[in-house]
A protein has these predicted regions:
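N-terminal basic, amphipathic alpha-helical segments
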Residues: 1-51, 255, 259-265, 274-280, ...
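Active-site donor-binding loop signature of nucleotide-sugar glycosyltransferases
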Residues: 2, 33, 144, 210, ...
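Short glycine-rich anion-binding loops that position phosphate/pyrophosphate groups of nucleotides
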Residues: 36, 170-173, 233
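Conserved core of the PLP fold type I
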Residues: 50-196, 200, 206-220, 226
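Short, well-ordered alpha-helical scaffold segment located
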Residues: 172, 249-250, 281
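Acidic catalytic patch
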Residues: 202, 269-273
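Active-site PLP attachment segment
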Residues: 212, 220-253, 265-268
Length: 294
């Protein structure tokens, strides 16, 4: 396959294109997708959710979805976050998106002004660096350690630059798989308050954690933390459902930008995701298997 052949230069564009190609002769998928093998996911539960929604199709499915997102799903997300991360957020503070990719894009375009210094994990997803640069931001790497961002290095950077935001993973950092300790989470949030920058917490792999997980947003400061989650990794990439939990100061700007760029998340996939969530997150049943194989 030409798209998988090694190019003269391996860059973000090549990596993105390779995500949609099968691995020749192996029947698998490239590692760049960040997805689990289909057999690790709950295909039958997804099928059941699709059938359930199909039996109760309503006229509302023939129109645009709600700009902020399907309310029953946002209520479920509020409960899910409280149970799995200790994040206290109301459904009114949640915006659904077309996957975590759109969530990152909306936040970046809302908060970054050309010339802003924007921190990222080092290493991090190359797509994120390109997105920040598209918004005119100047990305600066913060070394990632086994228990989270290097707090000492972060403090040094903050002493040299006025920082607008820090985009980082919490659970299962991409690409190292590192976690986040309570001590480091508290230290990073404390620096965010002292230096007045926004932590953009990308927790798309959080559903793979078997218990209550440590997050930045779980420390109770949605004024300085924006939380991103997604069902694309743990449920189905084709459903493209992500979400943002944030403080009220960012809520309306994000909804307005979402309206301008995509109008709404389709009502059908929102209802399918809601029906699936009502029966529990399928990946939770697969966590012991995932850990055993890894």
């Amino acid at each position: 396959d030409d798209a998988l052949a090694a190019p003269a230069r391996i860059d973000v564009n090549w990596l993105l294109r390779s995500m949609f190609q099968s691995v020749p002769g192996r029947g698998g998928m490239p590692g760049s997708t960040g997805l689990l093998p289909p057999q690790w996911l709950d295909e039958e539960m997804v099928n059941a959710a699709v059938r359930a929604v199909g039996r109760t199709l309503q006229a509302s499915l023939l129109s645009y979805g709600a700009p902020q997102g399907y309310l029953p799903l946002r209520k479920q997300l509020s409960m899910l976050l409280r149970q799995s991360t200790l994040i206290e957020v109301s459904p009114q503070q949640i915006v659904t998106t077309l996957g975590a990719t759109q969530a990152l894009d909306l936040i970046a375009r809302t908060v970054i002004v050309p010339g802003d210094h924007v921190l990222v994990d080092e290493p991090c997803n190359g797509n994120l660096i390109k997105l920040i640069r598209l918004c005119g931001g100047v990305p600066i790497g913060v070394p990632r350690l086994a228990d989270g961002p290097d707090v000492g290095a972060l403090a040094q950077i903050l002493g040299r630059h006025k920082v607008r935001a820090f985009f980082c993973n919490s659970t299962f950092h991409n690409p190292t798989g590192a976690g986040l300790s309570p001590k480091v989470a508290f230290a990073v949030v404390k620096l965010a308050v002292e230096h007045d920058f926004l932590i953009v917490e990308d927790d798309v792999y959080g559903d793979f954690f078997p218990g209550v997980r440590q997050t930045f947003a779980g420390l109770g400061d949605l004024e300085h933390v924006v939380y991103i989650g997604s069902f694309s990794k743990s449920l189905s990439a084709s459903l493209r459902i992500g979400y943002i939990a944030c403080g009220l100061q960012l809520l309306e700007p994000l909804i307005r930008l979402k309206l301008l760029t995509s109008v709404a998340v389709p009502g059908l996939i929102s209802r399918v995701t809601s029906a699936f969530s009502a029966n529990g997150t399928g990946i939770k049943n697969k966590v012991p298997l995932c850990i055993a194989i890894i």
